[in-house]
Amino acid sequence: MNHEVMNLFNPQAPAQTFDSIRISIASPEKILSWSYGEIKKPETINYRTFKPERDGLFCARIFGPIKDYECLCGKYKRMKYKGIICEKCGVEVTLSRVRRERMGHIELAAPVAHIWFLKSLPGRISTLLDLTLKDIERVLYFENYIVTESGLTSLKLHQLLSEEEYMLAIDEFGEDQFTAMIGAEAIYELLAGMELEKIANDLRVELSETTSELKQKKLIKRLKIVENFLESGNRPEWMIMKTIPVIPPDLRPLVPLDGGRFATSDLNDLYRRVINRNNRLKRLIELRAPGIIVRNEKRMVQEAVDALFDNGRRGRVITGANKRPLKSLSDMLKGKQGRFRQNLLGKRVDYSGRSVIVTGPELKLHQCGLPKKMALELFKPFIYARLDAKGYSSTVKQAKKLVEKEHPEVWDILDEVIREHPVLLNRAPTLHRLGIQAFEPILIEGKAIQLHPLVCTAFNADFDGDQMAVHVPLSLEAQLEARVLMMSTNNILHPANGAPIIVPSQDMVLGLYYLSIVSEKEPGEGMAFSDMGELHHALENKVVTLHTKIKGRVKNIDKDGKEVAKLYDTTPGRLIIGELLPKNPNISFDIVNQEMTKKNISKMIDQVYRHCGQKETVIFCDRIMQLGFSHACRAGISFGKDDMVIPDSKLRLVAETEALAKEYEQQYNDGLITQGEKYNKVVDAWGKCTDRVADEMMKRIQAVEFDPKTGRQRPMNSIYMMSHSGARGSANQMKQLAGMRGLMAKPSGEIIETPIISNFKEGLTVNEYFNSTHGARKGLADTALKTANSGYLTRRLVDVAQDAIISAVDCGTAKGLTMQPIVDAGQIVASLGQRILGRTALVDILHPVSGEVIVEGGVMIEETDVAKIEEAGIQSVQIRSALTCETRLGVCAKCYGRDLARGTPVNQGEAVGVIAAQSIGEPGTQLTMRTFHLGGTAQVVDSSHLEASYEGTVEIRNRNVVHNSEGHLVVMGRNMVILIKDGSGKERVVHRISYGAHIFVDDGDVVKCGQRIAEWDPYTRPILTEVEGYVGFEDMIDGLSVTETADESTGITKRLVIDWRANPRGADLKPAIIIHADKKGEDIAKYKGGEARYMMSVDTILSVEPGAHVKAGDVIARLPMESAKTKDITGGLPRVAELFEARRPKDHAIIAEVSGTIQFGRGYKNKRRIIIEPNDETLEPVEYLIPKGKLFHFQEGDQIEKGDYILDGNPAPHDILAIKGVEALASYLVNEIQEVYRLQGVLINDKHIEVIVRQMLQKVEITESGDSGYIPGDHVDRIELDEINDNLIAEGKRPASGNPILLGITKASLQTPSFISAASFQETTRVLTEAAVSGKIDTLQGLKENVIVGRLIPAGTGGTIAQIRRIAAVRDNLIVDERRKSSDSQVAKIMLTNMTTGATAE
């Protein structure tokens, strides 16, 4: 800001503010300009007087006085001598605070290289000089000479010479014919002599001429660094230092300990070493010591300086007295304990306290109970001020005494002070923004903080000894923000998914559920009640019970606000809950007239919030909590061991399964199935058995029983009530208590074949107990690791997304995403409505039949619109998304849509990036850590058949079926899809049917719910013949490509294809089954214009004999699923991290880049070459190499579409981006990440993941540079490139082009435009080195940079303040310009009059 100009009019201008920070390499002049004097001695303080030594590391003359306004010798004391320099000791009389600010310097006797620019990759010095790092080090550490001028000799420039070679060269050419130097001086000379402009031009010319890719890379790398130096105005020789700055002494203090010893900062040791060696070197040079000694000393100075800047980067680590490595300047910045993360981003807070929490059920939602003792301590300054104002005390000392003695008036004043003064409560770990909320304190006796039960979910708190911290907002602004934004009553909805988070849990749910139960044959059944008074009367007199079926009249208001009453079939309990509902036309009694499970209560609160607003909701929640507690207490629900009912059929089911397992064992012994198949089948059978026992148990537990004596319904099973209501416990836990525990996993994730048949009620046998402890211990170990991993993921997410802030209302983009319901295994997992609610429509959404507009383009889709869209049967909707938003910095409100935590359109300045990161990271601890090893385990076998889950009409897409010899319809296509449509023609379910499956329905058939549609063998993959004919074998040579194997345990033989390439004789074989058209086997049957030849892969089991007659659709060979078994399903947290880091998965899928025909090329030893001949003539054929043992679906001549998988597996996200584009990538990442969370039942809105993916897609890799001055391979911000291209096109120049690239979150964080943010994240030294060389400017746009420089963040209220400041600055500039113009015009007038008067005088 133009403060210089402002000073003309206002001499008392404020301290300079700044808009950006620039980092560059310090020149020697700069270092001297900072310094207040040279440090010549290594001494610190005098051991007798404890005064700093003159010219030493703590010298008072250089750094300033030790005591405020007092020189060292004591001649001048007090304020009146301010600014005088004492003639005796040379110390300036001023504040001692300057010892934190003043720097000194060390003048080096020989230059040294700065280790950051030497060693931090890529080594800047070596790249600039085009030498290897090793060579530079040899010169720097005095092993070799380097030729700096070759003259007319045969020596080359930059040639290295050893001592002998140097001597020989001098003998040969003479000393003055060439120059060779050694040490940092040599490098200094070379760097100083560089003409950067010329080098840059030469490199550009060379780059345009070269064709080798390796050379291009090298040239580009060098050119980048040369250009960085040119643009930033840094000089290369500044990377070699002649003076070293010394940081102020109070930042490396010397602290006296008791016992006369001192604790010192490591830096003092490191500086001392440098000074000692430097002084010794000076003396040696003065004494004209032999070259070899001087050189050794110079090397030692270089090493000392290296250790000071970055200890351990080169050579051995320098250790202190206690064998601990010394902390160098770099270590001061790095890591969790470094300056950035310890002091700048995280600070300790005063006015805070912590204590244990207990429940406070009588509090209102916005209150918390604060112990009096704590309040007295926290609000001390306010109390002192009030005591003074009321005249109880005249000094702070007096006030202090009153407070310490706890005078009665102090308590009255404390009450006044605390009233309406919110405090912040925080529970660690603070995983999302609901971990800190504001409450109004209520003074309580005791020492524990009371917390409102409803906010426990948000804090993830329980009362088993958790502690919480209290913070007092001091300034008026802070109090205002706490009250308006952070009050617990404002945080009713969860920012991750928009569902209520102030929801009753545990006892409250149980109480409400108990109230809402209906029982048969209760007293008073069928009575009718006109109002609540009557009902309470009847309940008091036990005429009816809470669960009696009755009719009740419920009053509500209609749209016009008139009272209406309606009669409902209900129970007294439900009417009592209904009494609390706010009166609103949109809220009917129906939402209470059902069993109040936790889900239903949540829905009810959601409805109340949407229709009645925040205030009503808060009152309603408080009332419902009271009701829940009181009825849970009255009901007295508890359970004993007899409530765990073991089903009678358990023994029968277990016996049946044991028989099955024996049968599979026998089949394996007979050689009908392999070891792996047996394992699969056994695990499968036990899995089914466990589920059936659990089902039987559930049937027993939830059965309605009647008391034969009274005829009344027996009370419901308590355990079932707790589980079913969602209060505590789950079906799985009930299964283990009263069913059977089932299969257990080993620590490796494999499933143990023998299940645990007992349950906890019966008790486990020793073997069973041992089996169950096996996997359980792994679970505990995982939990500890998980917390750390989850926290690290959150940190990376916050870092990458911290500058995504809502910065504009509408960016006006025409791009968006297409949303469809997510279907998994035929079930709709996420409906279209869930996915589009609260998003902005991209274009008008029209009714498919009537064509009327349901939602206009650019308008947010509300709940009512969703209902209309689903009614209309629309299957896909185009919406705006953060991914396609075109705002320059941040995201616009339209693309983001609804602020989930408030249910309204998002405000400007909302930090949506951080919210997204927290929403994704917070549930991280709930995800599993397990990588599922499918040793062909139960998970492979999802199912072996498919049943219709809806009634409707079948439609088959890409139909490709034949009748095989048994008359079954067999699927021959690889992408055949069966859809079931309901009466209105709406798609209900979609199933992809696998190759080789048998189907029982055809196009147009009508199916009933539960009817079997298809089945397949889950344990093997078949190879089918597509034509009828006779089998022939090709290249099937016994012992070479085929072998008859006998199963070792059964002795039964089968034919197996073995790896024929292992033997040199078999190198050219291509084992195949061919189908002949006739019995003689002369000509091969034709199919689709090609021959019916089926290549066999390793491990295929042959199912036919040569000469056998087969029909189309018959199985000729099968591949056991075991070859697909070792696929590890990376689940849970590691999978989420893998996706966000955009790592290439192990064994990733190979995706076709073009549409075309598959051809097989010549294979390699263990790779198979596949060529796609494109359908588009203009494109080149594409080749892929595939490992030979891999399962490969296609035959020669098959058609393949762009984006189809050639090889199955998890695709690499980069491939999806390159082949299918941004939208496909976005939907892939969103769906994959959501799938992991969905498995754990965690709801996260898509938009959060989209915001993170947007941050990962910020960069473009330049392919053609045009006239932009970029170099191909540069990574440029997408929006920056668009702006530069617009300018280039406007000037009629060639624009640059590039491809979008996907960066993992760590990489993206390190590549943010802000170097402060990147340095505080990871790899601090590398980031700062890079930034310094290129002279980067940090414009302080994101949140972290602003926190670090100590400003308000540019989000929320801080964003508004920043905006006001910007507007003010612009206006200031305008005013200054105006004033300057007016003063200029006055001067001009005077000059004119002077000129005219001068002219007339002449």
From Swiss-Prot:
- Provide the catalytic activity annotation: RNA(n) + a ribonucleoside 5'-triphosphate = RNA(n+1) + diphosphate
Q: Report residues binding Zn(2+) 1.
A: 71, 73, 86, 89
For this protein, the record's SUPFAM superfamilies field holds:
beta and beta-prime subunits of DNA dependent RNA-polymerase
Q: How is the cofactor bound?
A: Binds 1 Mg(2+) ion per subunit. Binds 2 Zn(2+) ions per subunit.
Report the function annotation for this chain.
DNA-dependent RNA polymerase catalyzes the transcription of DNA into RNA using the four ribonucleoside triphosphates as substrates.
Under what name is this protein listed? DNA-directed RNA polymerase subunit beta'
What NCBIfam families is this protein classified in? rpoC_TIGR
Native organism taxonomy: Bacteria, Pseudomonadati, Pseudomonadota, Alphaproteobacteria, Hyphomicrobiales
Q: Which CDD domains match?
A: RNAP_beta'_C (cd02655), RNAP_beta'_N (cd01609)
The enzyme's first-digit EC class, named in words, is transferase
For the keyword Cell membrane, the answer is: no
Q: How does it assemble?
A: The RNAP catalytic core consists of 2 alpha, 1 beta, 1 beta' and 1 omega subunit. When a sigma factor is associated with the core the holoenzyme is formed, which can initiate transcription.
Which residues does the record give as Mg(2+) binding sites?
462, 464, 466
